[in-house]
Regions:
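N-terminal low-complexity, intrinsically disordered segments
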Residues: 1-82
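Long protein-protein interaction modules used by eukaryotic assembly/scaffold proteins
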Residues: 66, 70-144
Length: 144
């Protein structure tokens, strides 16, 4: 599976699959949401669903044990896409890898502070939180 989650740049990122693509905005703390609310929920054997504000429309991802679905509200009616099946574990590993590879950029992605010192502190705090979540995910018995 190729890179799913693009390196954040200028307040935007992309989540891409062969049959589904969405833009993700700095309005949401994308890395935190994906790690904490999506991957960890899934690893606890629960259906995980997250919604992102894409500035003009919403994208919702729904992950079950074997399938990933995407819902986008930028069409009328909203589009519902079966994104993948049977590759859920590979998908989760790729998301973690993509976030880990660009950890510094993800740590600062949704920091809105204009004061330089406050910005540095918030970014450092976010980086520590993301690192802790990645560690927790990698140590989870259902991740392997």
């Amino acid at each position: 599976m190729s890179t799913l989650l693009a390196t954040p740049s200028a307040g935007w990122s992309h989540l891409s699959f062969p049959n589904f693509d969405t833009t993700l905005s700095y309005i949401d703390d994308v890395a935190l949401i994906l790690l904490q609310d999506f991957i960890l929920t899934y690893l606890k054997k629960q259906v995980a669903a997250v919604t992102f504000d894409c500035e003009g429309y919403d994208t919702t991802l729904v992950l079950s044990n074997y399938d990933l679905y995407g819902i986008q509200t930028n069409t009328e009616p909203a589009s519902f896409t079966h994104i993948l099946d049977d590759h859920v574990r590979e998908f989760l590993h790729q998301l973690v890898t993509n976030i880990e590879t660009d950890l510094d950029k993800w740590a600062s992605f949704s920091v809105f502070e204009t004061d330089k010192e406050t910005y540095k502190k918030e970014t450092a705090k976010n980086k520590t939180r993301l690192q802790a979540l990645i560690k927790e995910i990698k140590e989870h018995p259902n991740y392997g």
